[in-house]
Amino acid sequence: MSSLSYCLLVTGPAYGTQQASSAYQFAQALITMGHKLNTVFFYREGVYNGNQLTSPASDEFDLVSAWQMMATEHRFSMHICIAAALRRGVIDAQQASELNLPVANLAEGFELSGLGTLAEAMLICDRVVQF
């Protein structure tokens, strides 16, 4: 079987549902099988995966850090829907400054983007999988 390129759409938070952890495990499997993961786009409640203030208990899996490490190692982009993020209090330094907010909390390796970024990713990937 030939290698395929994938885009993942994650709509569940890092904790509280299985959507994000299932997406992470799926991403691991894709990479292990030799496929290319191009983009992970976090939408709706999925934007919480990019919150650097998430602090799981010491005996819990740190999904935010896991996404960061995987993206760095395998060189794929992680986009956070800017509109969904702003509604849920996940912001980068630029947005914090523009909105006169005291702190930014977007984790390193994640980028605020519009839905156009998702549309572009869907056009270039062989497969799009939503979690």
From Swiss-Prot:
It comes from the Bacteria. It is an enzyme of class 2 (transferase). GO terms for molecular function: sulfur carrier activity; sulfurtransferase activity. It is found in: Cytoplasm. PANTHER family: PROTEIN YCHN, SULFURTRANSFERASE TUSD. Heterohexamer, formed by a dimer of trimers. The hexameric TusBCD complex contains 2 copies each of TusB, TusC and TusD. The TusBCD complex interacts with TusE. Part of a sulfur-relay system required for 2-thiolation of 5-methylaminomethyl-2-thiouridine (mnm(5)s(2)U) at tRNA wobble positions. Accepts sulfur from TusA and transfers it in turn to TusE. Belongs to the DsrE/TusD family. This is Sulfurtransferase TusD.
